[in-house]
Amino acid sequence: MSEPITAEKFAIGQSVRRVEDPRLIKGFGRYSDDVNLPRQAYAVVVRSPHAHATIRSIDTSAARKARGVVGVLTGADLAADKLGDLPTDKSRKRRDGSPAYATPRPALARGRARHVGDPVALVVAETMEQAVDAAELVAVDYEPLPSIGATADAIRPGAPAIWAEAPDNVAFVWEAGNKDAVARGFAGAAHVTRLDFVVTRVAAAPMEPRGAVGEWDRRTGRYTLHTGIQAPHGLRTLLADQVFKVPHSDLHVITGEVGGSFGMKSGVYPEPVLVLWAAKRFGRPVKWTSDRREGFVTDEHGRDNVSTAELALDANGKFLALRVAITLNIGAYLTPRSAGPGTNNVGGIAGVYTTPAIHVQTTGVFSNTTPTGPYRGAGRPEATYAIERVIDVAARELKIDSIELRRRNLIPPTAMPFKTGLVFTYDCGDFARGMDMALALADRDGFEKRRAEARRHGKLRGLGIANPIEVAGGPYTAMNPDTASLRVNADGSVSLFTGSTSMGQGNETAFAQIVADRLGVPPERIQVFWGDSDALGAGRGNGGSGALTVGGSAVTRATEKIIERGRRIAARLLEAAPEDIVHKDGKFTVTGTDRGVTLANVARAAYVPRQLPQGMEPGFTEEASFTPPAVTFPNGSQICEIEIDEETGAVRVLRHSVVDDVGRMVNPMLV
């Protein structure tokens, strides 16, 4: 029999197995597709097979007559019901300073489809099979139009316009850094390195596809949406304010388990709108689940930019200035998330180096492709790729060892806090130490011997290094708060409601560890709840590497407020002054004595009015919010050694050495 887990062994800093895993392994998780409601109908979306086309007509007559069909809806029905368009980004500017074109994006396209997969009609039927069959009967007359797929093609002279209102296909232009200082740095440089590079487009493809179930209660006029989303409160707000135009109290979003997201499930998509709208139209719940093929053309894509990086160096190899131009493919629509990867996290282009002057220009361009958004780092990997690759090229041109060139330009720990040449101010970090640890781990000193041995066997061997740094808890310029509500029940058990969602990172375990550590409560008496817009008034959700830094800090503040309330109740029970009460390991004691009561004793009293201090209302619940005063900067060093077969070109990764400075670890097993 395994040893029972105690609060002490479940404390902050302990390696603890994920408490959610037994539930998930046994199949007891509740994902979007697990939601099935009485009288539920099923929806299938008819989508454009063309990248760009005029929609001449939509004939739904045959589909409406098909077996089991509840109804067929088009963009005309959407307009008749006066639903608002999906949110866009109205904060961006074009090159001349004029506002970016706020692309209209109804949940069902009207008049024109602008990418493969653009939704055109919605078929609702009694069963999924009937909905699929009926969808094939919807006859759409398309007139194909010239289209743009490649990023570089979007801004070439004569390129077809995706939007008439943006004839040059430029959605926005954004700049950061000191352009004049960069120009001076390049003017005085002994050497300039230029690198043109492409970061290819990717699809997220999480294990769980997107899905949504919509309900409408005709008695209350209230919508309820079940969907796997990173930020239920944010989605509730956007749908209520901009699409359905109802009070927030009339739209309830519930998120259960989320089977992976990588940023993709934090967007606002047409399908949640469609199932809620259809539920009201037909007076019954409506369910939609994406299949894998559908997801590839409708889930937000990531990356996709064509960029140029220029690095100016003096005669000793010191970095003088860095200039980066990014052409970012945002796809067919300007969404609230389109610009993020090319703007929020470009500060990482400075890397861990002392480059005094940096300038970045990001040009977002339209194309006839699926909209893009944050994906796995949301611009951080692209930023690291830019600086680390241009350093490698400069080292090759100058015939300087690439590690030595990095070392000459690393920010020393004595320079902290360090204001980089681009946006960020690092509060701490010992970057040389991290790199040296990685070099030792990779046995860099023995590399040349291994390379020579590989040559004798007809193999090429190479060693690459990168020193990444990222922002956590951001975005940097708009740090959002998170909320936590903590209730100690009358039996001493604890219920935690958090504004952060869980997408497989182990949040349930980490948050429970914080509560157990702070309150001294055994983990089996802690329940963590998330993903319900009714349970908390606000919530940040999960994204930007902020679940623990922001959400965990909100939980910590809630425990502090619980302890303070408990001190006052304990003082009443122990007939002592509140300032004489201390809390440790789940017990309140009078300073200098052995007199005390447990948290469970205090909780029991908290619900009995006569046992409370004068003026205190019964109950033992506290809510706390946390807005980070600054972001954090996890950093590290990675070294990869590979071997290439000269005859076949086959590449084999031989070793990959990683050192990460992530700060304080709540659970090393989760890091």
Task: For each feature predicted by the language model, list its residue ranges.
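Flexible, low-hydrophobicity surface segments
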Residues: 1-168, 172, 195, 271, ...
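Intrinsic disorder at enzyme termini
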Residues: 1-28, 432-454, 462, 468, ...
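Glycine-rich loop/linker segments at domain edges
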Residues: 20-23, 89, 95-103, 169-212, ...
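Alpha-helical support elements that line or immediately flank enzyme active sites
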Residues: 45-80, 121-142, 211-282, 336-348, ...
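Glycine-rich and small/hydrophobic secondary-structure elements
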Residues: 89-130, 263-315, 372-397, 418-443, ...
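Helix-loop-helix junctions that connect adjacent transmembrane helices in secondary transporters/permeases
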Residues: 158-244, 412-493
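Structured beta-strand/loop patches that form or line metal/cofactor-binding pockets in enzymes
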Residues: 286-309, 471-473, 623-646
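Internal maturation/activation junctions in enzymes
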Residues: 452, 578, 591-634
